[in-house]
């Protein structure tokens, strides 16, 4: 496997050439200081040979197949490790989420994978399509990875950054969604790590979801985020210079280099609280704003933002901003997240 990986020098190419399955390969030494193992197609683990690490880090991309910049970003980091330019000093699990959709150049094959975690893949119709099957496998790999880390002792930090890009433009180009975590403070250190990575906007979610990051946060108490790194572009057409800060901070993280983070300062970041989500209840749901409205566009109290079933849907707060508006989702799914500025969030 090592010869195969180093020969092709492109883990993404290997994954996309085998979108459904790759036989697992046991850990093999790399340059005398790193162990590399393959668990499945798009599932690669690096860990230091000496076992001396303190963090278990999951970097996932490609859960949506047309969100290519994070895929290219992670593939570049993988390539640098395989070719000896980077030496990982923490345990790292790289996941390329949806190879079939990447090959298609589409967001999904049959269903939105990022609504299928925390067991949702097996509810309703069950494991009825490739996204549901893959989501279940990805849960298994994350579980295995974090549980193997726990064997190395208590006090290890668990991290999961699920990387995406957005369909539409945004008033804040890069932003992160902090999953709902009742009874746990939000991490100021993590927020400032994101800021140093160029992600200066954070949304605090208000309820459980079935996203990949919520799965890791809830089940393993990981510092987990859904991170949006800009706008969707076709593979090979991303300006990777826009991700220089993100790449640098990820490199420091997996190589256990000093992060040099500023103390938490809410004036240096944009913090939003999710105040509600609006679900599609009937087929005639429609927004009143244009299809190219940017994420974080705000509307005043009383403004009609959508209609469905002959009823107007109004802005309820003094002002509410929209994120991820999509009127074309199936009935029963979320059409938009509504935001207000976060007031005194519990950050430690």
Swiss-Prot record:
Keyword entries, A-Z: Arginine metabolism, Hydrolase, Metal-binding, Zinc
EC number per UniProt: 3.5.1.96
Top-level enzyme category: hydrolase
Comment on bound cofactor: Binds 1 zinc ion per subunit.
GO BP terms: arginine catabolic process to glutamate; arginine catabolic process to succinate
Binding-site residues for Zn(2+), renumbered to this chain: 64, 67, 164
Co-factor requirement: Zn(2+)
Pathway connected to this protein: Amino-acid degradation; L-arginine degradation via AST pathway; L-glutamate and succinate from L-arginine: step 5/5
Recorded GO MF terms: hydrolase activity, acting on ester bonds; succinylglutamate desuccinylase activity; zinc ion binding
Catalytic activity entry: N-succinyl-L-glutamate + H2O = L-glutamate + succinate
Catalytic residues (positions): 228
Gene3D superfamilies in the record: Zn peptidases (3.40.630.10)
Function: Transforms N(2)-succinylglutamate into succinate and glutamate.
Family membership: Belongs to the AspA/AstE family. Succinylglutamate desuccinylase subfamily.
Protein name (Swiss-Prot/TrEMBL): Succinylglutamate desuccinylase
